[in-house]
From Swiss-Prot:
Organism, as annotated: Bos taurus (Bovine)
Family label: Belongs to the archaeal Rpo3/eukaryotic RPB3 RNA polymerase subunit family.
UniProt protein name: DNA-directed RNA polymerases I and III subunit RPAC1
SMART domains in the cross-refs: RPOLD
Residues with the N-acetylalanine modification: 2
Biological function: DNA-dependent RNA polymerase catalyzes the transcription of DNA into RNA using the four ribonucleoside triphosphates as substrates. Common component of RNA polymerases I and III which synthesize ribosomal RNA precursors and short non-coding RNAs including 5S rRNA, snRNAs, tRNAs and miRNAs, respectively. POLR1C/RPAC1 is part of the polymerase core and may function as a clamp element that moves to open and close the cleft.
Gene: POLR1C
Record text on subunit structure and interactions: Component of the RNA polymerase I and RNA polymerase III complexes consisting of at least 13 and 17 subunits, respectively. Pol I complex consists of a ten-subunit catalytic core composed of POLR1A/RPA1, POLR1B/RPA2, POLR1C/RPAC1, POLR1D/RPAC2, POLR1H/RPA12, POLR2E/RPABC1, POLR2F/RPABC2, POLR2H/RPABC3, POLR2K/RPABC4 and POLR2L/RPABC5; a mobile stalk subunit POLR1F/RPA43 protruding from the core and additional subunits homologous to general transcription factors POLR1E/RPA49 and POLR1G/RPA34.
GO terms under biological process: DNA-templated transcription
Matches recorded under Pfam families: RNA_pol_A_bac, RNA_pol_L
Length: 346
């Protein structure tokens, strides 16, 4: 019985010890364990695999992906970071820039501004095409000139009172429709995601006048095209108490974990510790610093239970980003199958 439990732990858990981590490699491949059928089975995979949405709001999504290998989960994460397309500033035509910010620095800063535009409605621009059309390009104009405020108090030292337009924000960017874009997109549909991003600061007489071309691209080419502020996953914590923990030890154990992980209950006049919500734990392993408590707790992670956190830059809702990432992954799989078929035909 103990041997069977040890094998099951090796197959399904990553165990965190005081000085190291065990069972970090996937070992459930065919023939590795006697008595286990680890051959690929589509029906078994469909039965065990599931996706549970835990939390979703306008810009963030947390969901569980259960029953899949780390290689596939990591591929999905990397696709979110680098292969889901967005629209971003690619070309900046500077007509006049007398600000303290150099042209090339200003252009780079503009490129990192998230643009609220659905990339699925646009095509990739052809290589070498400098002009752009309504199907592959968005155009923005930025024209701001700083002047003195004639109504400012004489003894004022506040720039906000002394000057007009001394701060250039993304709200000063104006969309210039190309072709029939004005008919296709309603007012306010094409804009910077945030209107309060500071671009530059000016003083009286200084001016910025430029034209921006936004194109479709992916984060693998440049980070400005990445649709997520972060996309990460962690394995589900699995915390087991090997023996009852009571009294002051229960309170001490609770303090060793993140709030809400260990709950102290009153049972027949005694304080008793129980694992309430292991999902909340960050695995600081603080419990291993306590000589008494480190022997009564086993810390592990469930090998095939991934907690994904996706935070959108605001270009697209996070659930749409996840759907697009799945489509990209399916396309990669299909191309691989097509290549295999082509090799077999040869």
């Amino acid at each position: 019985m103990a041997a069977a439990q040890a094998v099951e732990e090796m197959r399904t858990r990553v165990v965190l010890g005081e000085f190291g981590v065990r069972n970090v490699h996937t070992t459930d491949f065919p023939g590795n364990y006697s008595g286990y059928d680890d051959a690929w089975d589509q029906d078994r995979f469909e039965k065990n695999f599931r996706v549970d949405v835990v939390h979703m709001d306008e810009n963030s999504l947390e969901f569980d992906m259960v029953g899949i290998d780390a290689a596939i989960a990591n591929a999905f994460r990397r696709i979110l970071l680098a292969e889901v397309p967005t629209m971003a500033v690619e070309k900046v035509l500077v007509y006049n820039n007398t600000s303290i910010v150099q042209d090339e620095i200003l252009a780079h800063r503009l490129g990192l501004i998230p643009i609220h535009a659905d990339p699925r409605l646009f095509e990739y621009r052809n290589q070498g095409d400098e002009g752009g059309t309504e199907i592959d390009t968005l155009q923005f104009r930025l024209q701001v000139r700083c002047t003195r405020n004639p109504h400012a108090a004489k003894d004022s030292s506040d720039p906000n009172e002394l000057y007009v337009n001394h701060r250039v924000y993304t709200r000063h960017m104006t969309w210039v429709p190309l072709g029939n874009q004005a008919d296709l997109f309603p007012e306010g549909a094409i804009r910077p995601v945030h209107d309060d991003i500071l671009i530059a600061q000016l003083r009286p007489g200084q001016e910025i006048d430029l034209l921006m071309h936004c194109v479709k691209g992916i984060g693998k080419d440049h980070a400005k095209f990445s649709p997520v502020a972060t996309a990460s996953y962690r394995l589900l914590p699995d915390i087991t108490l090997l023996e009852p923990v009571e009294g002051e030890a229960a309170e001490e154990l609770s303090r060793c974990f993140s709030p809400g992980v260990i709950e102290v209950q009153e049972i027949q006049g005694k304080k008793v510790a129980r694992v309430a919500n292991p999902r909340l734990d960050t695995f600081s392993r603080e419990v291993f610093r306590n000589e008494k408590l480190k022997k009564v707790v086993r810390l592990a992670r469930v090998r095939d239970h991934f907690i994904f956190s996706v935070e959108s830059t605001g270009v697209l809702p996070p659930d749409v980003l996840v759907s697009e990432a799945i489509k990209v992954l399916m396309g990669k799989c299909q191309r691989f199958l097509d290549e295999l078929d082509a090799v077999q035909m040869d």
